[in-house]
Structure formats: structure tokens, C-alpha cells
């Protein structure tokens, strides 16, 4: 049975939306914006009201300019200081609190990446509110949806905090359009460096393959590959597909690959156009990290493997025969 809202209720709802304002904490590498920030902006737009982005860094003018062009962003706040090098949460927290004091946002959010998960709990603690982590949908300005029990159950959370602080699962929201916007840009509130931690260095592994969480195609291997050397089969296949390579926790724990390739509840969450699971049985923890993929292909010699329950296409066969055959066929195209 449906019940029509009274005119007064509609006016109050419209008024509430009008006064919503969301601050998105931008994740970036000074010259490039992290893709998850665009997904977070889309989530923020679902709340209604004005969306502002805070960019903190050392030489982040380009990122600020790029954000001004993003559809749906009304304002970009820029803070540049040597203290913000490396985006240390200890230094960013006072900046965000000062920004919140100035603009009185109703919502503060960031992507549910290592950056966001490290920063937002500090913000929430300082504001004395309970944060909401890893949301996958927004029902209203105070009602959010997230998964629990390794993705096997969905929880709807109603938040009555004065400021809603939450992190966004990037794979659950489309990326905001990188063009079409015309946001204004201004300097953010200045704060003194805290100085309790210092950014020293960062060493990035260079790879011709796309980054795992942003790749359109992912080829992942599990314990069925039997050794780290056999992961070369996946690397060869991935090269033909221009894909990223991932792994199950079992493969990581066995020492086959490093943990930066781990896909799953305790690893990285991915949702590519195509996910190929090779020699992966399909533990709940792994499924939680890839079940939102658009198309899932599973290769496993065990027909009872749980991975086939979520796969769109399944190949029950020896991976050591199938994967090289797939690679050779792709080479001939």
C-alpha cells in the first residue's frame, strides 16, 4: 500500500535536501587524481545539495583544475604545504576539521581505499561521531547501505549523527564525468603543521599492466597454480588481454605472489568488465572482493568449486592446458 506524502512533508524534505552539503576528500598523487575519487563524487551527488572537494598536497594545481571540470562539483578547496606531502592523516585531520568548522558540511566522505580508511576514522573521532565504512548505496541523506559477513548480507544503516562521515566502495558507483563541470576554486583554511609524523619516501613498482582496482579486465590465480613460477601463465594471458593480475588469499599466503595482488575481503575490491578466476575455489572472502564484476569466467578442474556458483561462464578443465591454449588463440587474433 502506498501513502502520499502531505504537502508539508514534501516541503520539509525539499528543504532538507537544499541544505545538504558534502565534502569529498580527494585522493591523488599531486599530478593525477585517483579514480576512486570520481566514484566518491557520484555517491556524494546522490545526497543532494552542494558537493565540494578538498585537495591537499604540495604541487596539486593540476588535480585541482581537473576537479573543477568534474560534473557535479560546485567548489574545490585547495591546500598546499610541504606538511601535506604523502597525504599523512595526522596532517590532514586538522585541515579537514578547520574546513568543516568554516563550511559546516552535513557529510564528509572519501573513497574506501587505504587512504580513506586511514583518514576518516580520525576525522570521525575528532568530531565525536560514528563513521560508516564501505557503503555500496545511499537511500537518503541519513540512510546508507553496506555489506556485512564477507558480503553475504546487506545492512541498511540509519545515521543520526550531526555530521555523517563515511567511506565509499568505488566499485559500487559509476565514476563522475571528468568534464562538463565549472566549479570555483579557492584556498582552504590554513592550519599549522602537526609535526608528529614525517613523510620519508615512496617506492612504486613500475608495471605496464593497469592498476588492479581500476582495470577493465582482471586475471586472478589461486592455490591451484601450485607455485609462484606458474603465475607466468597468468602474466602471459594478461598481457594479451591488457589485464591486471590478481590472486586469492590462499595464493598469497602460500608465497606465490606478493600481497599487493590479493583480491578479497582483506585485499582489494575489484569490479572489472571481465574477471577470470584461474585455479580459485571461491572462498567467501575472495568472492566478497570480486562478485560485482560484470562478467566472471572460472577455470577449475573441480566441478563442485564454489566459484562456479557466481561465474557467468565456467570451464571444468586442467588450467595448465586451458590457459596456454587461450593465450595462443589470443596471439593469433
Swiss-Prot record:
Subunit structure: Heterodimer composed of ETFA and ETFB. Identified in a complex that contains ETFA, ETFB and ETFRF1. Interaction with ETFRF1 promotes dissociation of the bound FAD and loss of electron transfer activity. Interacts with TASOR.
Protein name as annotated: Electron transfer flavoprotein subunit alpha, mitochondrial
Matching Pfam families: ETF, ETF_alpha
Family recorded in the similarity comment: Belongs to the ETF alpha-subunit/FixB family.
Span of the transit peptide along the chain: 1-19
Gene Ontology biological process: fatty acid beta-oxidation using acyl-CoA dehydrogenase
Subcellular location, record wording: Mitochondrion matrix
Amino acid at each position: 500500500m502506498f501513502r502520499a506524502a502531505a504537502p508539508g512533508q514534501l516541503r520539509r524534505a525539499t528543504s532538507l535536501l537544499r541544505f545538504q552539503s558534502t565534502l569529498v576528500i580527494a585522493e591523488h598523487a599531486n599530478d593525477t587524481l585517483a579514480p576512486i575519487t570520481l566514484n566518491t563524487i557520484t555517491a556524494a551527488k546522490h545526497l543532494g545539495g552542494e558537493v565540494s572537494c578538498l585537495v591537499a598536497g604540495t604541487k596539486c594545481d593540476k588535480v585541482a583544475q581537473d576537479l573543477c571540470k568534474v560534473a557535479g562539483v560546485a567548489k574545490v578547496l585547495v591546500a598546499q604545504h610541504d606538511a601535506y606531502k604523502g597525504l599523512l592523516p595526522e596532517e590532514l585531520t586538522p585541515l579537514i576539521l578547520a574546513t568543516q568548522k568554516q563550511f559546516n558540511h552535513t557529510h564528509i566522505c572519501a573513497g574506501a581505499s587505504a587512504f580513506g580508511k586511514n583518514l576518516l576514522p580520525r576525522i570521525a573521532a575528532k568530531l565525536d561521531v560514528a563513521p560508516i565504512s564501505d557503503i555500496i548505496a545511499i537511500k537518503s541523506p541519513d540512510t546508507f547501505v553496506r555489506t556485512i559477513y564477507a558480503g553475504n548480507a546487506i545492512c541498511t544503516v540509519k545515521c543520526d549523527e550531526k555530521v555523517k562521515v563515511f567511506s565509499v566502495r568505488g566499485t559500487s558507483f559509476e565514476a563522475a564525468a571528468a568534464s562538463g563541470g565549472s566549479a570555483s576554486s579557492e584556498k582552504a583554511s590554513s592550519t599549522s603543521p602537526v609535526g608528529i609524523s614525517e613523510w620519508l619516501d615512496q617506492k612504486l613498482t613500475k608495471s605496464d599492466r593497469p592498476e588492479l582496482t581500476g582495470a577493465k579486465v582482471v586475471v586472478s590465480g589461486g592455490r591451484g597454480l601450485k607455485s609462484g613460477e606458474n603465475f607466468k601463465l597468468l602474466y602471459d594471458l594478461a598481457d594479451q588481454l591488457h589485464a591486471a593480475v590478481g590472486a586469492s588469499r590462499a595464493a598469497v599466503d602460500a608465497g606465490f605472489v606478493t600481497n599487493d595482488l590479493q583480491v578479497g575481503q582483506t585485499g582489494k575490491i575489484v569490479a572489472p568488465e571481465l574477471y577470470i578466476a584461474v585455479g580459485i575455489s571461491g572462498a567467501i572472502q575472495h568472492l566478497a572482493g570480486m562478485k560485482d564484476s560484470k562478467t566472471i569466467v572460472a577455470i577449475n578442474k573441480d566441478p563442485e568449486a564454489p566459484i562456479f556458483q557466481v561465474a557467468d561462464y565456467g570451464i571444468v578443465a586442467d588450467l595448465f592446458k586451458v590457459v596456454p591454449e587461450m593465450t595462443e588463440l589470443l596471439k593469433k587474433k
